[in-house]
């Protein structure tokens, strides 16, 4: 197990490797072999790390490889490692080299990687040799260590690296369909399913993927060698251009779930996870966010419905889900939802329909969502759910009427009269010189619907026009 140790005051950091069975006392002894009790450790620079029992291992405290631990020493205490001499430190600081110091050991490392390559003689020197047969920790540049810490934190994300292990185990065909199918297979395995009828050495994902349905079951259902009698779920893939459609069914039931996976969105991200060097350097955010999005989509839309279905059919306890919560918690969740969402929840199952029919719940929603609502009736005789439904229908009709008015009253022409809903003149440019017996009219012309042309050489222009602008005079 590799831990990162950072001095509380100097902020200098280095890497230390420990055994999984080591305790907190062993870690203190590695820092200060003479007086281990003078070493104070913390995860947040405020609260000291203390074990209930001296025999508790670092693993039992929740520490894993890559964790960062802050340490400090009591006044007057120091480690047994020394620098070679002050002159060496001064000469190295003049050559743009930084001295990284920790309570376990002092060493000189280059802040700039190019300088490290150009100076091969730079080395870590321990004048006193190993202390108690223990190796000194490997010093690291702070910026480099922060990058490694971020990468180590990414490695703790179980889903992306579980996915990577599955892809590496069955690597071969690198087509987009195979990549997505193996990724779905990884989510199925992580959720507790096992592949039925297909040994890892016999089944070829690339060749048989589009011709067979993958059968999965749960380990507790495998009680006989006859696989035909085992309850199972089936998963089938269909390749449709840039989209892979995944179908899932429980046993021989007619009902099925399906989902679409976009190759252009998820395949490049999965390929980046497969590339170890890229994922370590960019360990971050955008890549793993998309992987988690893929994982959650497959689990919510495909795996969980199949898992609930097979558990229900086989009489097993269902997986952790909303319906397993106590009734009080379900009612509390419903109270936090808007009325329309409660109506949608009532369509899920019989139990939810029963919980959503509570009269007091709908009375609360009426008071919360109906404007200027006044309770004038009391008792259980009032059907508050029906009241809310009436209010909601009126609200929807009002919104639809308002939308219809805006769309049909602004510039729309009435079919029966041929007139526009807005009565203002439409402005056009000057007419040609040949109009109106050779008299050219300068300026624009306002056309009013339904007005005849007068005083313009007895000509009518499209039946609807008047010179210049009508300021309200007689026609």
Curated annotation (Swiss-Prot):
Residues 114-133 are annotated as: Disordered. GO terms for biological process: protein ubiquitination. One of its GO terms (cellular component) is nucleus. Residues 319-365 form the F-box domain. InterPro entries: F-box-like_dom_sf, F-box_dom. The keyword Nucleus applies. The keyword Nucleus applies. Keywords: Nucleus, Ubl conjugation pathway. It is found in: Nucleus. Pathway: Protein modification; protein ubiquitination. Part of a SCF (ASK-cullin-F-box) protein ligase complex. Interacts with SKP1A/ASK1 and SPK1B/ASK2. The F-box is necessary for the interaction with ASK proteins. Component of SCF(ASK-cullin-F-box) E3 ubiquitin ligase complexes, which may mediate the ubiquitination and subsequent proteasomal degradation of target proteins. PANTHER family: F-BOX PROTEIN SKIP22. This is F-box protein SKIP22. It comes from Arabidopsis thaliana. The lineage of its organism: Eukaryota, Viridiplantae, Streptophyta, Embryophyta, Tracheophyta. The gene is SKIP22.
């Amino acid at each position: 197990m590799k831990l990162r140790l950072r001095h509380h005051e100097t902020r200098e950091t280095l890497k230390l490797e420990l055994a999984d069975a080591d305790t907190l006392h062993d870690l203190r002894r590695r820092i200060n072999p003479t007086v281990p009790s003078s070493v104070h450790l913390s995860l947040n620079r405020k609260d000291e790390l203390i074990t209930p029992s001296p025999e508790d291992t670092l693993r039992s405290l929740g520490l894993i490889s890559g964790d960062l631990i802050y340490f400090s020493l009591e006044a007057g205490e120091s480690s047994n490692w020394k620098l070679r001499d002050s002159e060496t430190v001064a000469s190295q600081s003049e050559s743009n080299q930084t001295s990284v110091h920790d309570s376990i050991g002092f060493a000189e490392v280059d802040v700039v990687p190019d300088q490290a390559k150009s100076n091969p003689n730079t080395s870590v020197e321990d004048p006193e040799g190993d202390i108690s047969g223990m190796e000194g920790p490997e010093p690291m540049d702070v910026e480099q260590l922060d990058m490694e810490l971020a990468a180590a934190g990414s490695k703790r994300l179980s889903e992306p690296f579980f996915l990577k292990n599955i892809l590496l185990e069955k690597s071969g065909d690198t087509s987009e369909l195979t990549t997505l199918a193996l990724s779905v297979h990884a989510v199925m395995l992580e959720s507790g399913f096992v592949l039925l009828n297909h040994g890892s050495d016999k089944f070829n994902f690339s060749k048989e993927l589009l011709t067979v349905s993958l059968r999965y079951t749960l380990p507790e259902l495998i009680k006989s060698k006859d696989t035909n009698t085992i309850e199972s779920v089936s998963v089938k893939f269909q390749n449709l251009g840039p989209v892979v459609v995944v179908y899932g069914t429980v046993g021989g039931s007619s009902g099925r779930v399906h989902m679409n996976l976009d190759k252009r969105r998820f395949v490049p991200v999965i390929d980046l996870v497969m590339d170890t060097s890229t994922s370590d350097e960019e360990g971050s955010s955008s890549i793993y966010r998309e992987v988690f999005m893929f994982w959650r989509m497959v689990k919510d839309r495909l795996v969980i419905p199949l898992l609930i279905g097979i558990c229900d059919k086989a009489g097993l306890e269902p997986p952790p889900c909303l319906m397993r919560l106590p009734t009080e918690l379900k009612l509390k969740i419903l109270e936090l939802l808007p009325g329309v969402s409660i109506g949608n929840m009532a369509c899920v199952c019989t139990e939810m329909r029963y919980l959503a029919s509570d009269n007091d719940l709908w009375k609360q929603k009426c008071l919360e969502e109906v404007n200027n609502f006044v309770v004038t009736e009391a008792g259980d005789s009032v059907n508050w759910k029906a009241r809310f439904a009436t209010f909601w229908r009126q609200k929807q009709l009002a919104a639809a009427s308002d939308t219809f008015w805006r769309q049909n009253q602004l510039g729309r022409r009435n079919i029966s009269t041929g007139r526009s809903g807005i009565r203002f003149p439409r402005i056009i440019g000057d007419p040609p010189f040949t109009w109106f017996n050779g008299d050219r009219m300068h300026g624009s012309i306002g056309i009013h619907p339904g007005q005849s042309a007068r005083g313009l050489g007895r000509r009518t222009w499209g039946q609807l026009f008047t010179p210049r602008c009508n300021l309200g005079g007689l026609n």
